[in-house]
Amino acid sequence: MAGDVEIAHLDLADLAGVRKFADSVDRVDVLINNAGVLGLPLTRTADGFEAHMGTNYLGHFALTCLLGDKIKDRAISVVSASYALSRLHIDDLNWHNRKYSKWAAYGESKLAIMLFSCELARRGVRTYMTDPGATDTDITRDTTGLLPWVREHTFRRFPAHSAATGAQSTIQAVTTDLPSGSYLAPRFNQWGKPKVTRLRKKARDPAMARRLWELSVELTGCDWQNSDAG
């Protein structure tokens, strides 16, 4: 398959850069929200957001909304099974008033983007969520503490997917027409071929999703854009 590749700079941890990037784009057939950080100590983005929430969710929220109906086919978000162990603290999304946990911060950011994806589907946007499972990537490259050691020794015993294998759920979401809001995850939680998987109620909660959307608009200054709007 032949094609052209064009590379552009985009830092989802900086909303000014997100706006500049979105303004430069005329059309998107398929948007894949795949940026991610994991296991960072308490860090703030350029806009003051906690780094996991700011990068993994709020940056993607802003980008998706600013592109708006320039997205012609579908929007896909790469998520994580860690959402199942998470609880979204909607009144303290950016960890100003509670003891920080980098693992909880990551899980909450993934739960947030799943709620956002479900709300997009309710608003008529074709959207899917994909989970790569246990995949050997550099997402933990900036992690401190025990995780690098645990990761190395765990993957010796239980081999992780290659990045190419981990991408299969996303490729399936790009190339297959499924009901909007579908969640594709490995058959055996972290391993196995991707299949459509039922979301837990916490990721499908319409009231929480609406609250999160409204708060995200307030925090980012971005809302869904219609290109025909004056």
Positions of PLM-derived features:
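A short C-terminal helix-loop "cap" of Rossmann-like NAD(P)-dependent dehydrogenase/epimerase domains
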Residues: 96, 146-155
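Pocket-edge positions in alpha/beta enzyme catalytic cores
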Residues: 10, 158, 201-204
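Short, flexible, mixed-charge acidic loops at enzyme active sites
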Residues: 88-94, 142-147, 184-193
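C-terminal segments of enzyme domains that contribute to small-molecule binding surfaces
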Residues: 200-225
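C-terminal helical subdomain
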Residues: 109, 153-196, 206-210, 214
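Short acidic, glycine/proline-rich loop/turn micro-motifs
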Residues: 44, 194-200
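Rossmann-fold NAD(P)H-dependent dehydrogenase/reductase core
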Residues: 1-143, 218-230
